[in-house]
Amino acid sequence: RNPQITATLIGQALREAAPAQGEENFPLIVISHGYPGNRYLLSPLGENLASKGYVVVSIDHKDSTYEDQQHIKSTFYNRPLDQRFIIDSMGELNSTGGFLSGMIDMDNTGVVGYSMGGFGLVNNLGGGFNEAVVNSFGAPPQGLLAQHVSTDSRYRGGLDGRIKAGFAIVSFSQTFRNL
């Protein structure tokens, strides 16, 4: 996790490789890193899942990578939203004329979250924030976290039914109510 140390990852993925063609659509896996982190941190897992027939996408979360790390407050608010944005974006690529047109089974999406990525995942699976955290010292201003609280109607109405599975790795979860 030291951004000053260079690492070389040797894997099986190929840049600009054509997607595999199959008779059925492939499930989607979204990989969400910790705070700070980057899209490469779980690349061996992503490659392994892709080799087993999953469409895998890994996120660089804005304001939360080694290169652009900001205060963690923005991460609390944005992490669950980032994950849903990526799922929506993959749906667009899956639509007619998109790069992955008709290849993704969008109704069978899984999210792998490491640390703060697990935090977003748990929130997206129904683990709403505790009301006490909305106005706590570490929360973003203007009560932005209120829309992630389990008792908020926006939160309950916004849960994404496409997410059928989750794998939270050492999830940051002190702020959840429904665990």
Descriptions of predicted regions:
Residues 1-29:
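Domain-level recognition of soluble alpha/beta enzyme cores
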Residues 20-23, 145-179:
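The feature captures the conserved acid-bearing segment of alpha/beta-hydrolase catalytic domains
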Residues 26, 33-37:
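Active-site glycine-rich loops that stabilize anionic/oxyanionic intermediates
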Residues 31-34, 58:
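Structural cue for short, hydrophobic secondary-structure segments
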Residues 33, 113-115:
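Conserved alpha/beta-hydrolase "nucleophile elbow" surrounding the catalytic nucleophile
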Residues 36-41, 56:
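Serine-hydrolase catalytic-loop signature spanning alpha/beta hydrolases and amidase-signature enzymes
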Residues 41, 48, 71-107, 111, ...:
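Alpha/beta-hydrolase active-site loop
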Residues 48-66:
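Conserved alpha/beta-hydrolase
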